[in-house]
């Protein structure tokens, strides 16, 4: 099944228009690569040579999770780039209070997680233990928790912030947090 890229408006004070447009180009590449991987696996899987060390099938299957997670994580991230943060919703506030002991403690942990991440920082609800966690992904497919439901997604790859913030990760992270669209986050939390 072929996927198509979603359209995201530029409405953010977190990154410049140039950085946003460059980022959309990278996202479009993940969409295209997902479609290519899907096609190759459907038409040329080479099942007979599959093995755990290396090979055609293994390479394409590894690429499959990398590409589709690249699509999904970027879509969630672009949705998180809100220009009007507004107040945090009651359900979100209750969830953060219950699992982190308050907004300030969550924010401190989220900042530390994002600062430590090479790829992504995700506030996620992990279903197995019924716990909210800030999780760190060093790449699209490295660090995911299988039953985690993403609530807030922050791209920490250098391409996401370097154009506008250089090496000042803290400024990027703090600007992102101050711009979280809490109405959207409340919708995500309401399904839990």
Pin down the residues of each PLM region:
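Feature for soluble, non-membrane regions of globular proteins
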Residues: 1-192
């Amino acid at each position: 099944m072929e996927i198509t890229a979603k359209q995201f408006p530029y409405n953010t004070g977190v990154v410049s228009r140039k950085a946003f447009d460059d980022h959309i180009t990278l996202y479009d590449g993940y969409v295209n690569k997902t479609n290519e991987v899907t096609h190759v696996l459907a038409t040329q899987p080479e099942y007979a040579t599959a093995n755990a060390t290396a090979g055609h099938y293994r390479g394409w299957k590894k690429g499959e999770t990398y590409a589709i997670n690249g699509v999904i994580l970027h879509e969630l991230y672009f949705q998180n780039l809100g220009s009007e943060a507004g107040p945090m919703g009651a359900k979100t506030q209750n969830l953060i209070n219950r699992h982190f002991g308050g907004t300030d403690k969550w924010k401190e942990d989220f900042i530390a997680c994002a600062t430590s991440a090479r790829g992504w920082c995700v506030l996620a609800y992990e279903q197995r233990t019924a716990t909210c966690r800030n999780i760190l992904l060093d790449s699209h497919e490295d660090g995911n928790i299988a039953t985690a439901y993403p609530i807030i997604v922050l791209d920490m790859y250098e391409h996401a912030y370097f154009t506008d913030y250089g090496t000042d990760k803290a400024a990027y992270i703090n600007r992102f947090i101050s711009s979280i669209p809490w109405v959207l986050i409340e919708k995500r939390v309401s399904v839990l």
